[in-house]
């Protein structure tokens, strides 16, 4: 166990070489569609000393940055290495919703926009699913369209975009 982890940290294993900035886009995509709240949560981390009972945001930011720095330093990089940081990201996103101001409203509008974009992407799946060509899964594209999963995703993302827009307007 230790040898295998040390090997992945110090040398590239299975051609999983990625640039040093690899986990930046992974963090952005992993937080979708609430990426604006993650950005807002990170921007609102107090840069000064706060009492321990109010330090959850600093703790979550340190946790997220520690995982980011640790796996950025590793030679082998995979998107799944980001998983230990997801609870910290969730805390930062949740804490970003606690203070009502124009930045929070911006984050809501941007998140709803991302949900709407995802709905459009799923509705357009007949256009892009055919581009998926993987020799190990030759029937993935027709199977994916035939399963109805992308249509259900399109429907649910559309529903979420409309419902959250109505709620935001009524606030």
Segments predicted by a language model, with ranges:
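Juxtamembrane membrane-water interface segments that cap and precede transmembrane helices
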Residues: 1-23, 132-148
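Residue-level signal for the membrane-embedded core of alpha-helical transmembrane segments
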Residues: 32-37, 88
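Membrane-interface loop-to-helix entry segments
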Residues: 24, 28-31
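Generic structural signal for secondary-structure transition and capping sites
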Residues: 5-6, 29, 47
């Amino acid at each position: 166990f230790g040898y295998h982890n040390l090997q992945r940290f110090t040398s590239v294993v299975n051609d999983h070489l990625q640039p040093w900035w690899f986990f930046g886009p992974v963090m952005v995509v992993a937080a979708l569609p609430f990426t604006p709240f993650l950005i807002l949560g990170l921007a609102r981390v107090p840069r000064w000393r706060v009492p321990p009972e109010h330090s959850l945001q600093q703790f979550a930011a340190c946790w997220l940055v520690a995982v980011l720095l640790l796996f950025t330093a590793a030679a082998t990089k995979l998107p799944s290495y980001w998983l230990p940081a997801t609870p910290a990201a969730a805390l930062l996103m949740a804490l970003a919703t606690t203070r009502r101001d124009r930045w929070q409203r911006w984050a809501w509008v941007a998140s709803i926009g991302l949900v709407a974009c995802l709905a459009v992407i799923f509705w357009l799946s007949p256009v892009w699913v055919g581009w998926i060509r993987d020799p190990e899964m030759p029937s993935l594209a027709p199977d994916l369209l035939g399963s109805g999963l992308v249509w259900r995703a399109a429907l649910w993302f559309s529903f979420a975009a409309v419902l959250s827009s109505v709620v935001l307007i009524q606030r």
